């Protein structure tokens, strides 16, 4: 096992990365190795998908499958070895279908790629786990050096985050052939184990550029399906009655669940990154979507254990449900998986509903406590003139974008301290589950109007923040980096990595990121990123605030 993709990975004087029987996330060495094998198969699939396009051959099923299967290897998504093997087998099936189709117009097609003809050596978990060791991500680490190894992983993990957003968009009916060509190009290239540092940095930024287009496509999918988010208050206290909790990012799953539970006397609560759902008109109209429950994903083992109903995981982040003894009432769907947990197919939530009706539900209604969400792209852009007026009047001095992934490190209290300590003439734009560090605090308003805390949505709604910045830049006639706006990113996994690469690709400089640096990037690479882009780590809220304001 060698896995170094998330913030909680092991960091020791002997080396970084989880490399024993189980990762810090709970992923076994077996599953981790099989994920490496799956990735190798996906490299091969992408290489042949590109070759097929030279002949005008497009297999849309293969295109859709490729990023979805890659998403399954993202942190805290799929821990089920059998499911991972199934994805690898399907990747080879699609690859062979492409080769067959190409052969009809180009007999005995040739492809110069090291993984062009990879085959699975066996069908059992043990056989494939043994083969998987050949494809560990650190096999040539000593040969190429830490810098090249780290930036190659930066590109791979960034592409993994972009693959997740491609899948989220596809679920909502959004598909762009040109973006899939770009995706396959990057995936095939990474399968060649590139080792030129400058090329790796350039490609990493190119992956970020691609992801900006992916986020735009996802934004269109969400707003066309559910309407533009509008500011809305959300109750964060329990309501008496039977209940279902839904977590993850897939708003379509929530819509299906709301339709199937309507009129059944079951209250539905959002958790984690589902919180922004309460701002979408086509979701908030359901009266039995009663509120939000819990906090950041890392607290789920305690909070899910206390939740008296059924639980649905639609995407990341999932952790061991056996610890809190709720494995019999949690369900997975889409690419999520945990051994022994019931997996739902085709949006059939009947087992969830049945379990919810069996459970006790909340015995009484607690005193209501509301927070506000719904500051999506359109709302933010519509407010841009008001923001400019406040800036010109000296009533708004700075906007801080504070968001990203949450996690369980004590150092993450930094984000709470920073947000709460900011002067009253500043505003905080937040997104991602990092918001749970401070989104239940009262920040008040500026000049009696603009809320000081603006929740823009999920991590992919970084797009909304970017479009606000672009709009302000255009209206003020200044560059993005001249705006009184700073970004303090909270990273944990690969979606945050691709968000960072997207920002850097757009030319956004002086981003702060923490609470710690990625374990796969050494000090030399971090210094390089600081020199080229002004990327900085965190110190203390007071020191960083002073540095930002005085720049």
Swiss-Prot record:
- Quote the record's binding site residues for hybrid [4Fe-2O-2S] cluster: 249, 273, 317, 405, 433, 459, 493, 495
Name the Enzyme Commission number(s) assigned to this protein.
1.7.99.1
Cofactor(s) this protein cannot do without: [2Fe-2S] cluster; hybrid [4Fe-2O-2S] cluster
Q: What is its main location?
A: cytoplasm
| Functional summary from the UniProt entry | Catalyzes the reduction of hydroxylamine to form NH(3) and H(2)O.
Spell out the NCBIfam families in the cross-references: hybrid_clust (TIGR01703), PRK05290.1 (NF003658)
Q: What name is this protein filed under?
A: Hydroxylamine reductase
